């Protein structure tokens, strides 16, 4: 006998908003700390201002109503988008008003991009260097010029129009943020309707977004860039609306346009292969990816996401239910599997945010690697300053997101985790064997640390003793990265083997010939050797330590053998009360604090490796006699000792920033000095004792009382947690600005 299954319930999507839930009033803006009973009384001590900053955006502490918290977060997102549009508008406005974009467009290999002109106040005009084409300004390394050319922008007037459009969008975002909190605020069930959210984000944002960009690339970017590549004067190129409306004009450049949509509806899509290509490699004129490959990519991505956006069950009884998928996800050894995770992810926005930050951060680091290996925009590859800036930027952004993932995962564990709903599921099982996980991870870190540094120490010792034949190097004892070389070769051979329709490999870095643009190397095969093998294991070591610190913070955020009731103490606390020595700096917050230092450690070595490797083995000038690299291939010979890193990278390459005074790069010299100072200032907070400062403050207050000038607000030393926060902020700010000035002064001088 067959039993028909009960009819699957289909979620009926209703319009779920509350009308006018919160009146619009500016009065709260005049009451700092209005969200907290303690803070709204005003300051009695200087601790008040620190607590105000710490809690202003901690919506959890303002109310326990999940619906109101969700609305505040939703509204704040619109505010964030508004700020982003204003920033973007400012970038386009600078391109329109203060830049040499049109001159750069006419000669991108000789003229450098500039979109900032310094006003003379007391001699600052020295910063306006000669960037070519008779323009004086600061050389920029953001990549906007290359992006604008790829988009098909041919005049500064178009940049003006786009800048105004950005401000209009910003206004729309700010309005939406106000409207969806004060006028029509979504109910909690709207925020928790994950199937509808997935469908709309996948099909709308990613699917239609990619489709719109593919359409722009096909109808506007491709024809304009084809004409620019052929040397047509930007002023002679047809305007975008002409290209969109005049099919004959397009058919001259791409003959398949003459056939209209017939091949599309008869499924003969191959007819369009003149503008939807699969060439691989780089355009030899611009050193960027083929824009026709990019259009093809975005169209294919759009199709995939439009399909994906119809996967989840909403009003109709078909498609996936997220809860069913998660609860069906059981392995033979994992107990209840993912049961209970649906409830976590629909009621804890910290848990949701932790996963999204981990994914987005990892993606940002992947983007950093793709942007130099497969430069997406024309003339990006030969602009070495921009290449270095984009790599560094995406690596650091990724690192901050990943540490943020650790932070919010721990906040979820402390504030939102309910053990009763998580019995024997994967999360519970991970927490129950956390000792095994952390001790094994700790062993891995010790192993990697001693072995990777041990190889360097061996080399430094042998080098000092004058025994080069006993060193690990490409010329003595070789430690070749054979697996990486095999991966490179496999990808290089793909067009003949696994990807027969591609005309060339995805990236020139896999192998093949040098791509040179205007006498500079755009990209060439990257040979890996012993020095790369050594520093790779330093990367493995530092990344594993960062993960160890963050994961330990998450897994022990509610309890530990040392402090069994840690969950009651909250996310951040200095110590487990008086009389319990040795329990300081164990809060989940302190793990995030320590994780930030190791993230910075880890990624400094990544960007140093990239910077030196590219200058040594890739970037340089091309003449009839061959390639001359910036540092002449010294990476393989020098980067296998710690002394080599100190002498031939840090010391040798800092000469440009140290000697920049009196030149257009002098601001980088001052920044290098100032950022070192900011970094050193952080140590005052990190190595300090709170009692020392409290004692000092009280003697200073005594002096003020004597003179009858004592303040009404009593001064207090920073708490331990506040001191560490100020310390890590200045440590990272100082370190990042030091690296920024060091990199840019160097690469703008020699690149």
Swiss-Prot record:
GO terms for cellular component: chloroplast thylakoid membrane; photosystem I. One of its GO terms (molecular function) is 4 iron, 4 sulfur cluster binding. Its EC number is 1.97.1.12. Phylloquinone binds at residue 693. P700 is a chlorophyll a/chlorophyll a' dimer, A0 is one or more chlorophyll a, A1 is one or both phylloquinones and FX is a shared 4Fe-4S iron-sulfur center. SUPFAM superfamilies: Photosystem I subunits PsaA/PsaB. Chlorophyll a' binds at residue 676. It is found in: Plastid, Chloroplast thylakoid membrane. Chlorophyll a binds at residues 684, 692. Its main location: plastid. This is Photosystem I P700 chlorophyll a apoprotein A1.
């Amino acid at each position: 006998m067959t039993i028909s299954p009960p009819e699957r319930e289909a979620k009926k999507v209703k319009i779920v908003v509350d009308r006018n839930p919160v009146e619009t009033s500016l009065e709260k803006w005049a009451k700092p700390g209005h969200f907290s009973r303690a803070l709204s009384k005003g300051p009695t001590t200087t601790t008040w201002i620190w607590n105000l900053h710490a809690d202003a955006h901690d919506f959890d502490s303002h109310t326990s109503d999940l619906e109101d918290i969700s609305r505040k977060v939703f509204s704040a997102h619109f505010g964030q988008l508004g700020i982003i549009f204003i920033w973007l508008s400012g970038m386009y406005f600078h391109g329109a008003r203060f830049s040499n974009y049109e001159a750069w467009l006419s000669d991108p290999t000789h003229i450098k991009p500039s979109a900032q002109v310094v006003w003379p106040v007391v001699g600052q005009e020295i910063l306006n260097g000669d960037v070519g084409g008779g323009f004086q300004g600061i050389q920029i390394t953001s990549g906007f010029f290359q992006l604008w050319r790829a988009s098909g922008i041919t005049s500064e007037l178009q940049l003006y129009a786009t800048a105004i459009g950005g401000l209009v969008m910003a206004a729309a975002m700010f309005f939406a943020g106000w409207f969806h909190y004060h006028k029509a605020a979504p109910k909690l069930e709207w925020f928790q309707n994950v199937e509808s959210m997935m469908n709309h984000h996948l099909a709308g944002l990613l699917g239609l977004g990619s489709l719109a960009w593919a359409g722009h690339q096909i109808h506007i970017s491709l024809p304009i860039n084809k004409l620019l590549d052929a040397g047509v004067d930007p002023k002679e190129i047809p305007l975008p609306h002409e290209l969109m409306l005049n099919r004959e004009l397009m058919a001259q450049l791409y003959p398949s346009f003459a056939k209209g949509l017939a091949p599309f509806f008869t499924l003969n899509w191959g007819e369009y292969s003149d503008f939807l290509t699969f060439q691989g490699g780089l355009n030899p004129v611009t050193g960027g990816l083929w824009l026709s490959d990019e259009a093809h990519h975005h169209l294919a991505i759009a199709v995939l996401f439009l399909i994906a956006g119809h996967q989840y069950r909403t009003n109709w009884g078909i498609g996936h239910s997220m809860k069913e998928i998660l609860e069906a996800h059981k392995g033979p050894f994992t107990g209840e599997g993912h049961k209970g995770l649906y409830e976590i992810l629909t009621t804890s926005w910290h848990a949701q945010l932790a996963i999204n930050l981990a994914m987005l951060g990892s993606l940002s680091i992947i983007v950093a690697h793709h942007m130099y290996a497969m430069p997406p925009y024309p003339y990006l590859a030969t602009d070495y300053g921009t290449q270095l800036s984009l790599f560094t930027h995406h690596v650091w952004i990724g690192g901050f997101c990943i540490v943020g993932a650790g932070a919010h995962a721990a906040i979820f564990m402390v504030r939102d985790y309910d053990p009763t709903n998580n019995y024997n599921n994967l999360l519970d099982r991970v927490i129950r064997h956390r000792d095994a996980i952390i001790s094994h991870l700790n062993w891995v870190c010790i192993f990697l640390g001693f072995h990777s540094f041990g190889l360097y120490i061996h080399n430094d010792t042998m080098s000092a003793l004058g025994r080069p034949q006993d060193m690990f190097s490409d010329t003595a004892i070789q430690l070749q990265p054979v697996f990486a070389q095999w991966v490179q070769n496999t990808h290089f051979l793909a067009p003949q083997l696994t990807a027969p329709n591609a005309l060339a490999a995805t990236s020139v870095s896999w192998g093949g010939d040098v791509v040179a643009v205007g006498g500079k190397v755009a990209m060439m095969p990257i040979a890996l050797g012993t020095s790369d093998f050594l520093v790779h294991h330093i990367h493995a070591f530092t990344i594993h330590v960062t993960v160890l610190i963050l994961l330990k913070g998450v897994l022990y955020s509610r309890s530990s053998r040392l402090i069994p009731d840690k969950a009651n103490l909250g996310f951040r606390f200095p110590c487990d009360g008086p009389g319990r020595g040795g329990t300081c700096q164990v809060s989940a917050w302190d793990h995030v604090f320590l994780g930030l230092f190791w993230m910075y450690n880890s990624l400094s070595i990544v960007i140093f490796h990239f910077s030196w490797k590219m200058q040594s083995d890739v970037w340089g000038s091309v003449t009839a006699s061959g390639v001359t690299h910036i540092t002449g291939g010294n990476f393989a010979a020098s980067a296998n000792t710690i002394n080599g890193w100190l002498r031939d990278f840090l010391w040798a390459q800092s000469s440009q920033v140290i000697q920049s005074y009196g030149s257009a790069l002098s601001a980088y010299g001052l920044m290098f000095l100032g950022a070192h100072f900011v970094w050193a200032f952080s140590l005052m907070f990190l190595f300090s004792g709170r009692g020392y400062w409290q004692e000092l403050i009280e003697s200073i207050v005594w002096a003020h009382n004597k003179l009858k000038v004592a303040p009404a607000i009593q001064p207090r030393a920073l708490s331990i947690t506040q001191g560490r926060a100020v310390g890590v902020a200045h440590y990272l700010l100082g370190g990042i600005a030091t690296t920024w000035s060091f990199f840019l002064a160097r690469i703008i001088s020699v690149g």
